[in-house]
């Protein structure tokens, strides 16, 4: 049995494999989102679009134009986190299709965990053994292993 561990926040995701109860997670790959470090003002390209509409005005007001916004403001950081979560989910779906893991443990910063949970495909969600709401992206593999739920570790063989 092989467990894939994804350790993520809104800017980075590290993927590890664990195949024994006593072993240390082995690094598999990493995804980064360089846009996650930008400020909201740097992520926004412009104000929301605007359009004109003559039909909304009363018939007696010739030549007048009404201007309307195309929608409410969208928070750029939240949007960027959703885009990155879809990339992480896509990576997990690809790995699951290629039978690279049997079980999945998701360790993510609490706000990002919720975003990631929403975008995980059902085919991947079926393999989720546990979720840990902690940002461990910059921690060494030994620390990642220390945060593994004991019941998930007990599913692994003692040695490989």
Language-model regions, residue ranges each:
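Terminal alpha-helical anchor/extension segments at protein ends
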Residues: 1-160
